[in-house]
């Protein structure tokens, strides 16, 4: 029997009475109280998440930008220091190995954040793809903890935490840092990366610290947030990201799925100079018959789930990739890959929910946008 990996905050989660689940070989908190309560807490106030199972890969050296331009679909060399970019790691055939956020750090290095399920694969791919360049690829996953604070009061809580700490970070700069930008500094003697990024559809921060500082950072944030900050597990993170129309690897993304199918054609930069992995395959691919990702909404309380068939006039035209009864909106929502001729906004389709037809309508993503 394989022993599950534990994050640096495992003891904290146990003390809070969390329920755990196996996620990509990690023993992760799935919930602390209830999925709904945690979901609503993030939409109304703020939630705190342990995301230390994610992978962190540092790319350093004079050719870092060029190496990432070759390894990834985006033009990372054009990303200014202190900014971040969402990009894709592709196969030679143009399928998606992983979707990633890459930070161009103020010191000139790049930090690539990989999904937990793909961290080892991603590391191997970056090591192989960067071998021709003058760079160093370093796996910092085991030494790094990641804590996210997300929700309407996230900014207030993080600023309050900074005021309680001995830090080189400027509170005004942290407050004003824009979406997909980051700052570095020290927090009570530990290095910290503060990024205005997230996976919930809400405002907030993701904070990276050494693993040994994880419990200290968590408690600092909890003390600052008080009743306005709720510990949140992976269950509500999934419902939050689905409402926000954000893809999840293994559901909306995979090596058999190409970027344009998932609505991510914009992420692939064909204008950048030189080759990149997957370029030739995508440039020569006929996409006219590819199924495409759409949003579906329905009425009532029954929700389609991953794998359920999408039907049009008694013909199966697709399948759901993720589906829930939306806690925020109060009706069923789903993302699905469907045939292109039924993907137009406003098209009526049905979902086979255990032998019963759920009437749905194709809608624009995301389902939820914060005001």
Curated annotation (Swiss-Prot):
**Which domain of life, per UniProt?**
Bacteria
Reactions catalysed, as given in the entry: N(6)-[(R)-S(8)-aminomethyldihydrolipoyl]-L-lysyl-[protein] + (6S)-5,6,7,8-tetrahydrofolate = N(6)-[(R)-dihydrolipoyl]-L-lysyl-[protein] + (6R)-5,10-methylene-5,6,7,8-tetrahydrofolate + NH4(+)
Q: Where, by residue number, does the polypeptide cross the bilayer?
A: none
Q: Identify the InterPro entries for this entry.
A: GCS_T, GCS_T_bac, GCST_C, GCV_T_N, GcvT/YgfZ/DmdA, GcvT/YgfZ_C, TrmE/GcvT_dom1
The family database entries (SUPFAM superfamilies) matched by this protein are listed as: Aminomethyltransferase beta-barrel domain, Folate-binding domain
This protein's GO cellular component annotations are: cytosol; glycine cleavage complex
- Record GO biological process: glycine decarboxylation via glycine cleavage system
- Keyword check for Ion transport, yes or no: no
Q: Name one GO molecular function term.
A: transaminase activity
Q: What is its EC number?
A: 2.1.2.10
User: Which keywords does this Swiss-Prot/TrEMBL entry list?
Assistant: Aminotransferase, Transferase
Q: What does it do? A: The glycine cleavage system catalyzes the degradation of glycine.
Report the PANTHER family cross-referenced here: AMINOMETHYLTRANSFERASE (PTHR43757), AMINOMETHYLTRANSFERASE, MITOCHONDRIAL (PTHR43757:SF2)
Task: Give the family from UniProt.
Answer: Belongs to the GcvT family.
According to the record's subunit comment, the protein's assembly and interactions are: The glycine cleavage system is composed of four proteins: P, T, L and H.
Name of protein: Aminomethyltransferase
Gene source species: Cutibacterium acnes (strain DSM 16379 / KPA171202)
């Amino acid at each position: 029997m394989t022993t599950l990996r534990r994050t640096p905050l495992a003891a904290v989660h146990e003390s809070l009475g969390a329920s755990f689940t196996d996620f990509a070989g990690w023993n992760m908190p799935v919930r602390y109280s209830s999925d709904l309560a945690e979901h609503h807490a993030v939409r109304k106030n703020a939630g705190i998440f342990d995301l230390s199972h994610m992978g962190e890969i540092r790319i350093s050296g004079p050719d870092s930008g060029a190496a990432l331009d070759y390894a990834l679909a985006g033009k990372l060399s054009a990303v200014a220091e202190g900014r971040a970019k969402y990009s894709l790691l592709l196969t030679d055939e143009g399928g998606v190995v992983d979707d990633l956020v890459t930070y161009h750090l103020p010191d000139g290095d790049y930090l690539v954040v990989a999904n937990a399920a793909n961290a080892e694969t991603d590391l191997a791919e970056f090591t192989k793809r960067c071998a021709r360049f003058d760079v160093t690829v370093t796996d910092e996953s085991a030494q790094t903890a990641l804590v996210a604070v997300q929700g309407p009061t996230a900014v207030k809580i993080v600023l309050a935490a900074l005021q309680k700490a001995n830090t080189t970070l400027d509170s005004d700069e942290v407050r004003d840092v824009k979406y997909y930008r980051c700052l570095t500094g020290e927090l009570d003697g530990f290095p910290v990366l503060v990024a205005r990024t997230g996976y919930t559809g809400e405002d907030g921060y993701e904070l990276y610290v050494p693993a040994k500082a994880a419990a200290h950072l968590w408690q600092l944030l909890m003390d600052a947030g008080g009743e306005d900050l709720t510990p949140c597990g992976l269950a509500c993170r999934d419902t939050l990201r689905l409402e926000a129309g954000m893809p999840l690897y293994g559901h909306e993304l995979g090596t058999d799925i190409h970027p344009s199918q998932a609505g991510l054609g914009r992420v692939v930069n064909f204008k950048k100079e030189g080759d990149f992995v997957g370029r030739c395959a995508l440039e020569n691919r006929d996409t006219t018959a590819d199924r495409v990702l759409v949003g579906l909404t329905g009425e009532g309380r029954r929700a389609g789930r991953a794998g359920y068939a999408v039907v049009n006039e008694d013909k199966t035209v697709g399948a759901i990739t993720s589906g829930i009864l939306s806690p925020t909106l109060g009706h069923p929502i789903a993302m699905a890959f469907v045939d292109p001729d039924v993907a137009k906004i406003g098209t009526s389709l049905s979902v086979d929910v255990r032998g019963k037809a759920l009437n749905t309508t194709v809608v624009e993503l995301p389902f939820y946008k914060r005001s």
